[in-house]
Amino acid sequence: MEKGECILYPCYFNAALSRAEGRRVPRNIAAKGPNANDVERALRRLGIACQAEEHHHPAHWARHEGRIIATYTGKKEALIKKVARAIEVRK
């Protein structure tokens, strides 16, 4: 991973998961069953360069949900919240 890159997994935005299971945003801005394409679309709408990969979250190795590498120089938590608000798939 290069400097200025953030790895985002769809589980960060999944309202069905608990914080212990990997969700990183509050439930009120989380999405229902987001996938890597939803995260990628949200990043592109925000004007953030990104690239999808066929990898999985280490804790969810059997799901093969993919991941997104975003080029972002700010804090990862700020990026995660921006993306969560931009994802169109909601509860």
UniProtKB/Swiss-Prot annotation:
Please tell me whether the keyword Cytoplasm is annotated for this protein: yes
Superkingdom of origin: Archaea
Q: Where in the cell is it found?
A: Cytoplasm
Q: Which UniProt keywords apply?
A: Cytoplasm, Ribonucleoprotein, RNA-binding, Signal recognition particle
Annotated InterPro entries: Signal_recog_particle_SRP19, SRP19-like_sf, SRP19_arc-type
Pfam families, per database record: SRP19 (PF01922)
Coiled coil spans? none
An example molecular function term from Gene Ontology annotations? 7S RNA binding
Spell out the GO cellular component terms annotated for this protein, sorted alphabetically and separated by semicolons: signal recognition particle
Question: Does the keyword Membrane belong to this entry?
Answer: no
The family assignment reads: Belongs to the SRP19 family.
Q: What does this protein do?
A: Involved in targeting and insertion of nascent membrane proteins into the cytoplasmic membrane. Binds directly to 7S RNA and mediates binding of the 54 kDa subunit of the SRP.
Assembly and oligomerization: Part of the signal recognition particle protein translocation system, which is composed of SRP and FtsY. Archaeal SRP consists of a 7S RNA molecule of 300 nucleotides and two protein subunits: SRP54 and SRP19.
The protein's name: Signal recognition particle 19 kDa protein
According to its UniProt entry, this protein's organism is Methanoregula boonei (strain DSM 21154 / JCM 14090 / 6A8)
Taxonomy, top ranks, is: Archaea, Methanobacteriati, Methanobacteriota, Stenosarchaea group, Methanomicrobia
Q: State the encoding gene.
A: srp19
